[in-house]
C-alpha cells in the first residue's frame, strides 16, 4: 500500500499501475503553488477512476473524528458516495487484513456501529450513539457535562 498520498497528480497513472491500495489524506491541505485549486480535493476521485482502492486517514488521534467529513468533501469533488463510505469502512478493514471481522454490517463480524441523525458524511449530522463490539458507549464526557452545566 502507499501511505499519505496527497499531492500526487503528476504521477497518478504510475500510482494506479502499482495495483496497491492508497491511503489518502488529509485532503484539507492547501494546493501547492503549481497545482490547481482542487488538486488535493479531487485526488480521491481521480484515484478511484483509475481503479485504485482508497482509504482516508487523519494522521492524528484528535482528527480521526473528521474522517467522515474528508469522505464527504471528496464526494463534492467527484468521488461516488458509496466509494466514500467504503473508504472509511470496509476498504480500511480490508487493507489492514481484518475485513473478515470489521468494516461492514455482516453476520459474524464485530458490531461496531455509529448511529447518527442524518447523512454520516455531512458536517451538520450529529452522532447520537456509538456501539463498539456490540456495547453502547456512553455519549457523555467532561466536555458535554460542562456544556450542559453552563448552558442553563
PLM region spans:
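Catalytic beta/alpha-barrel core
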Residues: 1-8, 27, 31-33
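His/Asp/Glu-enriched, well-ordered alpha-helical/loop segment
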Residues: 13-116, 125, 136
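Polyanionic/metal-chelating signatures
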Residues: 8-11, 126, 132
